[in-house]
UniProtKB/Swiss-Prot annotation:
One of its GO terms (biological process) is maturation of LSU-rRNA from tricistronic rRNA transcript (SSU-rRNA, 5.8S rRNA, LSU-rRNA). This is Ribosome biogenesis protein erb1. Residues 36-46 have a biased composition (Basic and acidic residues). Belongs to the WD repeat BOP1/ERB1 family. Keywords: Nucleus, Repeat, Ribosome biogenesis, rRNA processing, WD repeat. Component of the NOP7 complex, composed of erb1, nop7 and ytm1. The complex is held together by erb1, which interacts with nop7 via its N-terminal domain and with ytm1 via a high-affinity interaction between the seven-bladed beta-propeller domains of the 2 proteins. The NOP7 complex associates with the 66S pre-ribosome. GO terms for molecular function: large ribosomal subunit rRNA binding; ribonucleoprotein complex binding. Residues 60-73 have a biased composition (Acidic residues). HAMAP family: BOP1. Pfam families: BOP1NT, WD40. Residues 1-103, 529-553 are annotated as: Disordered. It is found in: Nucleus, Nucleolus; Nucleus, Nucleoplasm.
Amino acid sequence: MSVNPRKRKVVTRPAPEPSDSEGELGDGLLEGILSHSEDDSDNSREEEVDTDASSVIEGLSDEDEEEDEDSDSEQIRTEMRNLNTSDGPLRKKKGVPTHDMDLDTAVTEELEDDEDLKPNYTVTTDAHGNTRYIYKEIDPVYESDDSDVEATNTIGNIDLKYYDEYPHIGYDINGKKIMRPAKGEALDALLDSIDIPKGWTGLTDPQTGKPLNLSEEELDVLKRLTRNEVVEDGYDPYPEMVAYFSGKQEIMPLSAAPEPKRRFIPSKHEAKRVMKLVKAIREGRIQPYRAPEEQEEEQDAFNFDVWADEKPRPDNSMHIPAPKLPPPGYEASYHPPPEYLPDKAEEQAWLEADEEDREREFLPKNYDALRKVPGYETFVKERFERSLDLYLAPRIRRNRLNIDPESLLPKLPNPEDLKPFPTTCAAIFRGQEGRVRCVSIDPNGIFVASGGDDGYVRIWELLTGRQVWNAKLSDEEAVDAVQWRPKKDASVVAAACGENVFLIVPFTLLSPDVEQASREVLDAGWGYATSKPSTSSNGEAPKQAPGKWSRPGARLENKGVLVQVEVRSAVKIVNWHRRGDYFATVSPRGQSTAVAIHTVSKHLTQLPFRRLKGIAQTAQFHPSKAIFFVATRNTIRSYDLAKQELVKILQPGAKWISSIDVHPGGDNLIVGTYDKRLLWHDLDLSNKPYKTLRFHKEAIRAVRFHQGGLPLFADTSDDGTIQIFHGKVVGDLMENATIVPLKVLKGHKVRSRLGVMGLDWHPKEPWCVSAGADGTLRLWS
C-alpha cells in the first residue's frame, strides 16, 4: 500500500434520517455499548480531515497520468465506506476518544464515574520533555492472575440464538441489558473486506456479538504456530532427560532412598527370555506371520520323506548327559575264574537275604560255551529301574576348577636376592658320644660349646672344628643346656646337668685379663652370701633356699668349673639376661619352682612365681625391656618384672610348645611346637599368630633368631633338616613382617626318631651351628 503525499479532498455527506429502530432502542440503552462499534470508529476516523492518516488510501497510485482517475475512485470508495446503516444519526458518546480530542483527556472523562475503571497509570514528563507513563504496582493477589476476570456478558455458556427475538443479547454485571450491536449491510462487509483493520478475523464474539479482533500477542502466537516455532518465550521443548526423574520438579524428594542397582544393569531374566526367543527363531519353532493364502499353497505340496529336511538339533543348554553304567567285572562273565564262583553256603545266604540287602543283583555262574548261556531273567527289570533312576534322580554338573596352584601363592622375592644366608656344610665336629643336645657360640664368635648325653661339656674352635676343652660334669645325667654369657668383658659358660647348673670359665683358652675378669664376676657373690643376715627368728628353722650356691670340688675347679648352683628339679633350659648378671632356668618337672631367676653377683636364686598355670617349657628375657616371657605347653605369658604384673598372654594355638625366641627388636617372637608348626607372633598386632609355617614332617626342637643384625632365623626338626628363613622387620607399624623361606639344610642323620636337637647363630656372620642326635656338630655357611 503506497502513501500519497497529497491530501485527499474532504467529502461531505448528509446525515441519515432517524429510523424506527433508533427510537425503539433509545439513546440511554446504547450508552457505552455502541461506542466501540466499527461504525462509530469509522465515523470518528473519517471526521478528522487535516491529519496524515486521511492521506493514506489503499490502492492509491503515485503516477501523475492516473491522478484524476484515482481521485474519482477514491471519492466513490470513501462515500461507500461512510454510509451509515443505522436509521438515525448516532450522537457522539460522552468520553469516546476521537482524533479531535486528546487521548488522555478522553480516557480520564470516561472513567471519572467509576473508580474501578480508572487508568492504572499517571502521565508525567521525563527529563527530556517526553511523555512518561508511571504505572501503579501490581497487586499479586488479583491483578497478576486473569483467572477471575469479570466477563462482559454474564449469561454463561448459553447460545445467543435464544436471544434472536430480543433487542438485547444478555446482561452485564450490574444487571443491565446489553443491547444488540448494529449490523452492517453487505456493502459494509465488502468495504470491511477491502480495508481490513489490524487484528481482523471476520468472526463475531458469541458473547458480545461484536467483531472478534485479535491482539498483538495473539497474532504473534498464531504466527509462531504457523512457523512451527515455540509459542512461549523461555520454554525448552527438549529438557535434559533424567532416567529416574518423573518430569515434575519437587522441592523435597518423595523418597530419599537410593536407586537400587537393578535399575542400572541389564535384567538377567529378560536376557534369558530373549535368548529363548532367539533360539526358537533360529530353530524355526517361531515363524513370522504369513498370509493364509501362502499357507494353503504350501499345504498342497506333500513331502513323503519325513526326515528329508531333518537337521541335527543341539542339546539344550541345561542338558546333562546320563551317567554311564560301570563296566562289568569278572563276576559278570559267563566263564568267570573259580575264585569268583560262590560256594553252596554263599549261594544259600544270597538266596535267603532280602533283595535290598544283597551285594549283587545276580549270582555268578559258569558256562562252558557262550551258546549255552540262557536268557537273562531280570534284564527287563534292570532296564526299567535304570529308566526310573534316569527319570527321577536329579542330576548336577560339577565344574572342575582349572587353577594353577602356583597362582594362589603370594609373590615372594627371589631367594638369590636375599643373600647372604647359610647354604652348605663347612665343617663337621666329631668326638661327642651319644646325642648332642645343646650348642652355643661365644659372643666373640671364636669358640663353640656343646653338651650331650655323655655328661661332657666340650668347647670347639669354630673355624677348624678342633676340640680345645672338655669337662665331665656327671656320669649319669646328660648336659641338657649350654649357654655363653652375652657380655664380652668376661667369658663364662652356664651348663645345666640334672639338678645342677655349673658356671664355667675355660681359663686355658682365655687371655690373663679375660680370665681375671671372669673369675671376679663369679667370686663377687661369695662375699655377699657371707655378709647376708640370717632370715630365721625366734629359734625357728630357716626356710629352705630355692637354690644352693657352692663350689663343685677340686677336680672340676682345676678344669675351670668354679660355681655350682643346685635347684630342686632337673634343669632343661638356661637363658642369660642381656647384662650378664642374671640367668633364668626352667625345670619342667617342678611346679612352683619350675622357673627360677639367678643373680650371679649375689649368688642369689629367686622364684618369681608362687604358682604357675600349666607346665613350664621354656623362658626368655626381653632384649631391651624388663619383660620376662614364660612358655607353658599351650600359652606364652609375658610379665613386667619391674611392676610385677602380667602384660599379655599369647595364644599360639599349639598342642605343645617346644621352644621360643624373641626378635632383637623386641616386637616379634617365634614359637616352635612339637606338632610340626613354626609360629610368628607380632606382639603389637594380636595375641594370635601372624604367620603359621608348616614345612617339617616331624616335631620342631629349636628356633633361633640371628642376633647380629641380619634378617635371618632358623628352626630344627626331628626329620633331620634345618629350615632357614628371611624375616624382615621394619620400624613402620603399618607394614607387616616379610617372611620368605630360603634354604633347607640337610646333613644330620635321624637316630631313634630324633634329628637336629639344637641350633645357634654366629654373632656377626651368616653362619649357624647345629647339634644332631647322630653325635655331630655341623657348621653351615
